[in-house]
Design a protein with these regions (language model features):
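Conserved functional hotspots at enzyme active or ligand-binding sites that engage polyanionic ligands
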Residues: 1-126
Length: 126
């Protein structure tokens, strides 16, 4: 369904044997959503451990947003990556489960430094 005159981007299907890794960033369709949850088609970081990613059909992800607000919150971290279309903020207070069928495409993998920062932000949420 196109909205506001925008053409929806087509994504090739992910390979059935794809190995999802902690720190991977994927374009995901997080619809439907409710209330203040982050929804829509957006990038998200896989934060679940690799064993869980292998055995489960569900990933634990942190959504990203290009709306950079409250950047000083301890649960927010801004990413500047070549594989993201714009600077994007990890919203680490809102990790969520997402079925692998929601994955549209692989975008890239965070550096060790970036993933450490995301992990620190996640610790503030738990």
């Amino acid at each position: 369904m196109a909205t506001r005159g925008k053409k929806e981007k087509e994504y090739p299907p992910m390979p059935a044997n794809w190995m999802y890794k902690r720190g991977d960033v994927y374009m995901m369709d997080l619809n439907p959503y409710s209330g203040s949850e982050q929804g829509g088609v957006r990038p998200a970081i896989v934060v679940q451990n690799d064993d869980g990613n292998f055995y489960s059909n569900v990933l634990l992800v942190v959504p990203l947003t290009t709306q950079i607000k409250k950047r000083n919150m301890p649960t927010h971290f801004v990413l500047h990556n070549r594989f993201l279309s714009a600077p994007s903020m990890a919203i680490c207070e809102s990790p969520r489960p997402a079925d692998k069928s929601r994955v549209l495409s692989y975008l890239g993998h965070l550096s060790k430094y970036e993933m450490r920062q995301v992990s620190v932000c996640l610790q503030y949420s738990f």
